[in-house]
Regions:
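Charged helix-capping and loop-helix junction motifs
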Residues: 26, 58-66, 233-239
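Active-site-adjacent C-terminal substructures of enzyme catalytic domains
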Residues: 82, 177-293, 313
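Short, surface-exposed secondary-structure edge patches
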Residues: 295-299
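Hydrophobic residues within beta-strands of alpha/beta enzymes
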Residues: 43-45, 109, 200, 252
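Metal-coordinating catalytic core of metallo-dependent amide/deamination hydrolases
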Residues: 49-53, 58, 62-183, 255
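C-terminal cap of metal-dependent C-N hydrolases
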Residues: 284, 300-329
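Metal-associated gating/positioning segment near the N- to mid-region
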Residues: 1-62
Length: 329
C-alpha cells in the first residue's frame, strides 16, 4: 500500500505531551516498523513546516534529519518520502523553507492554511477544543488560547496572502508536486486548480469534494474518518461520501492511524465495492497521482510490493509484507 500523508512519525518523537524522544534515528526506525507492519510499503512522511507550537517547531530539524539519514544509510524497510505540509499562515514560513527546501527526498508539498476561522478551523470552537486541551499549544488554559487566537487571526491572513504565491513558486521551480490542503469552498478548489495543483488533500466539505472532481483533481480522504464514520474536526464524513458516490474518493490516507488504511479497503468490500476497485485507493491511485510509475499494481518490470492478509473476527490481519519481492514483515 502507498500512503501519501501520515504524521505518525511525530508520535514517536513526542510520545507524550512535552516529552521529546532524544534518539531521532531510533524514533524513525520505530515508526518504519509500525508503518510496515500496517501493510504500508511506500510512505510519505508528513512534516509540518511552519507552525505556532514551540514543541513541534523544536523537533522539525530532527524529524527531517531522521528520515534523511535513515534513507542514506538504508535503515528503513519501507520506501520513505518527505511530504512537506506548508503552514501558509505562519509569518516565518519562508525563512523556514529557505533552510529545508533543498532536501533530496522531498516528493510532495501541501499548501495548508490553519488561520482561525478558515478551512479546517472555520469553526473556532473546534479549534479551541482541539488545541486548548493540550499543553502543546498553550500552557495557560483556554483564556490564553482565546487571546492568542485573536492575535493569530490578525497576522495569519496577511501571512497567508503573502506566502501562498511565493511558496507555490518555490515548489514549482523545484518541480515538486503540490497538493491543496483542507479545501472548504469551491473558491478554494478553483484557486488550487488555477495554481496548477491537481491533488485536493482532505477537502472538508461535500461542496469542495464535488468541485475538485469537476476539475478532475484527485481527492485524498482520511481513512480514520471513514472507519470512525465521522471526522475528528467536524468535516465531511467520508463514509457519507462513499455511500453517496464512491467515485468522489480517489485516494485514502491513514493520516494518524496507519492500520486504518487496510481496514478501509475491507470496509469498502463490505459495502459492495469489489476488491480491485477498493485496493486502487491505497495502491494504484496514490502512486499515479505522484508519478510513481514503478509501483501501485503488480506487473512485469514493476516493484513487487504486496501483502498477505487474513481475517480474525472480521478484522483484516496483515500476515506478511513483501517489498521488491522480499519478505520484510
Amino acid at each position: 500500500m502507498i500512503e501519501l500523508h501520515t504524521d505518525n512519525l511525530e508520535k514517536h518523537f513526542i510520545p507524550r505531551p512535552n516529552a521529546i524522544w532524544p534518539n531521532k534515528i531510533a524514533a524513525a526506525i520505530a515508526n518504519d516498523n509500525e508503518i510496515v507492519s500496517s501493510g504500508i510499503t511506500t510512505v510519505f512522511d508528513a512534516i509540518l513546516v511552519g507552525n505556532y507550537t514551540k514543541i513541534r517547531t523544536s523537533i522539525l530539524d530532527d524529524i527531517i534529519t531522521s528520515i534523511t539519514r535513515g534513507k542514506d544509510l538504508g535503515l528503513f524497510k519501507a520506501d520513505h518520502h518527505l511530504h512537506y505540509i506548508c503552514e501558509l499562515s505562519d509569518p516565518e514560513l519562508l525563512e523556514t523553507l529557505e533552510k529545508y527546501s533543498d532536501n533530496k527526498y522531498i516528493t510532495l508539498a501541501s499548501l495548508m492554511d490553519h488561520t482561525p476561522g478558515q478551512r479546517q478551523w472555520r469553526n473556532k470552537e473546534k479549534m479551541l477544543e482541539f488545541y486548548g486541551k493540550g499543553s502543546n499549544f498553550t500552557s495557560h488554559g483556554a483564556y490564553d488560547f482565546d487571546e492568542r487566537m485573536l492575535r493569530l487571526e490578525e497576522t495569519a491572513k496577511e501571512a497567508e496572502k503573502k506566502n501562498r504565491p511565493k511558496v507555490s513558486t518555490i515548489w514549482r521551480e523545484k518541480k515538486i508536486i503540490m497538493a491543496s490542503h483542507d479545501d472548504t469552498t469551491e473558491e478554494h478548489v478553483n484557486e488550487a486548480s488555477k495554481n496548477g495543483i491537481y491533488i485536493s488533500e482532505f477537502p472538508t466539505t461535500l461542496e469542495a469534494v464535488k468541485q475538485a472532481k469537476k476539475l478532475k483533481m484527485k481527492t485524498v480522504l482520511g481513512a480514520p474518518n471513514f472507519i470512525r464514520n465521522k471526522s475528528h474536526s467536524d468535516n465531511v464524513s467520508v463514509n457519507d461520501l462513499v455511500d453517496n458516490n464512491f467515485d468522489l474518493v480517489d485516494i485514502f490516507s491513514s493520516d494518524y492511524v496507519p492500520l486504518s488504511l487496510i481496514q478501509s479497503v475491507f470496509k469498502l468490500l463490505h459495502k459492495g465495492v469489489n476488491l480491485s476497485e477498493s485496493t486502487k485507493l491505497v495502491s494504484y491511485n496514490p502512486a499515479n497521482s505522484v508519478g510513481l510509475d514503478d509501483r501501485g499494481n503488480i506487473e512485469i518490470n514493476k516493484r513487487s510490493d504486496f501483502l498477505r492478509v487474513a481475517f480474525v473476527e472480521n478484522t483484516p490481519l496483515i500476515k506478511e509484507v513483501y517489498i521488491k519481492g522480499k519478505r520484510v514483515n
